[in-house]
Design a protein with these regions (language model features):
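Extended C-terminal regions of large enzymes
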Residues: 1-9, 15-456
């Protein structure tokens, strides 16, 4: 459960506007378990599998442990996606957080290494940080930054001051702001400021040069309070650009939602998913390309359960990569429908794979379900959202990315010179529609698909 903040897609801001601080639900009945022994056995299986699983490192470094991986592959978004490498990456990575600011004493549910956790969880991925001296003192009540946050409020903005990033994270969690959109919006403003599309008169005198940690922290507070220039940025970079009438060439959005810290120029299936996803750019709506590229042999048995048997070359975006994106999107949608954690459960590197998840549902409900039936649940959810969007006039025309991803090449490191090929990408989008059974011209679900999914 999320016990601190709920910011992505603006839900935290909506709660804040209503002065709603939390939603608490209490029941007085225990859920009926169809096969307790089978469920207990799955728990034992997970305990035994944990040491050799892909989630063991999350307990020590959290998701910030992947900073070095992203840097090595040229996929660490830097200076508002102008580059995929950041010279100051070591200042914001997992080991640095662990050694420098991770809370070190037991308080409440936290353990001796400053890890908060969901009830009964073996992985214990959440970070809790505390800073008691210097210009940025940070209260552990507001948790700590994970990978997305150290990137968006770090490398995106060219900031290599970990304490400033932790402080900005605290402010976001205090106000219910999404750290991804907040950091990306500030990075957009910094690039626009550098290009003189935004002036110091508009920023209220703030010097929004890349790397200015003090300005980043101050602007985060201003956004949360809708003060001064923060009021212009408070609804995201796309609306800020529209309001100012300039700066669109610096946007990194899909459906007006800022891109997370996984670069679509590097992970090409995400270039597709960011665009076609019903609620815009999201890194937790499908599996990532490496699982179906060089990492396939590690996850072969699990992916084959989903019918994924033909690993692809890096940065490819042909029909089979589209198939990977679509099927894992359905699977992740299923996980959301079941309210399962995407670190504990998933199609590749996670602790529990597709086979175990089927057994889990069978044990709890007693239903004799198959993986195909469960994938249809995820597909049904996505089509419901797609139908809602169609009613609101959101269709193929909005299934795209900001021009920057197509027009500007990355600078430096392994991804130097990379950009998204528009022709290849548009062909992949059409292929995705065909595989989904949607109308290619509009991108909307067809009557046949809606009837098949009992949504007609």
């Amino acid at each position: 459960m999320c016990n601190r903040a709920n910011g992505r897609t603006g839900m935290g801001a909506v709660m804040g506007s209503k002065n709603l601080k939390a939603v608490a639900v209490r029941g007085n009945q225990k859920p009926a378990i169809a096969d307790k022994e089978a469920l207990t056995e799955l728990g034992r299986w997970g305990f035994k599998a944990f040491p050799s699983s892909g989630v063991t490192g999350l307990g020590k470094y959290g998701t910030a442990g992947v900073v070095s991986v992203q840097q090595t592959m040229g996929g660490l978004p830097t200076f508002n996606f102008r580059s995929g490498v950041f010279d100051g990456w070591k200042t914001i990575d997992g080991p640095t957080i662990y050694e420098a600011v991770l809370k070190g004493r037991e308080t409440g549910k936290q353990d001796q290494e400053g890890r908060d956790t969901c009830f009964g969880c073996l992985i214990r991925c959440k970070r809790v940080v505390e800073i008691n001296e210097g210009p940025y003192q940070v209260d552990p009540l507001y948790g700590g930054p994970e990978y997305e946050t150290v990137a968006t409020l770090g490398s995106y903005c060219g900031v290599n001051d970990l304490t400033a990033t932790c402080k900005a994270n605290e402010i976001c969690n205090k106000y219910g702001l999404d750290t991804i959109s907040c950091g990306a919006t500030i990075a957009w403003a910094m690039e626009a400021f550098e290009a003189r599309a935004i002036t110091s008169n508009e920023t209220g005198g703030l010097d929004l040069e890349f790397g200015n940690a003090e300005a980043m922290v101050k602007l985060t507070e201003m956004i949360g309070r809708r003060e001064g220039f923060g009021d212009i940025l408070a609804e995201g970079s796309a609306r800020a650009s529209q309001r100012l009438g300039r700066g669109a060439e610096f946007l990194i959005t899909a459906k007006n939602q800022e891109a997370p810290a996984h670069m679509p120029q590097v992970k090409r299936s995400l270039a597709l998913i960011y665009a076609v996803n019903p609620f815009g750019a999201d890194h937790m709506s499908s599996d990532h390309d490496p699982s179906y590229e060089e990492g396939f042999e590690n996850f072969k048995k699990r992916l084959e359960v989903l019918g994924l048997t033909q690993p692809q070359k890096p940065r490819s975006l042909g029909p089979e990569k589209v198939n990977f994106a679509r099927k894992t999107q359905h699977f992740y949608s299923l996980l959301d429908s079941l309210n399962l954690c995407q670190f504990a459960c998933g199609p590749s590197w996670q602790l529990y794979g597709p086979v175990e998840i089927v057994k889990m549902l069978q044990a709890v409900t007693g239903w004799d379900v198959t993986i195909e039936e469960l994938l249809a649940v995820g597909e049904r959810r996505l089509n419901m959202m797609r139908a809602f969007n169609a009613r609101e006039g959101i269709n193929r025309n909005q299934d795209t990315l900001s021009e920057k991803f197509f027009e500007k090449t990355l600078k430096g490191g392994p991804s130097d010179g990379w950009k998204i090929d528009r022709v290849e990408w548009e062909a992949a989008r059409d292929e995705y529609y065909r595989q989904c059974g949607w109308d290619v011209k509009s991108g909307e679900p067809t009557r046949h698909v809606l009837d098949r999914l009992n949504l007609g």
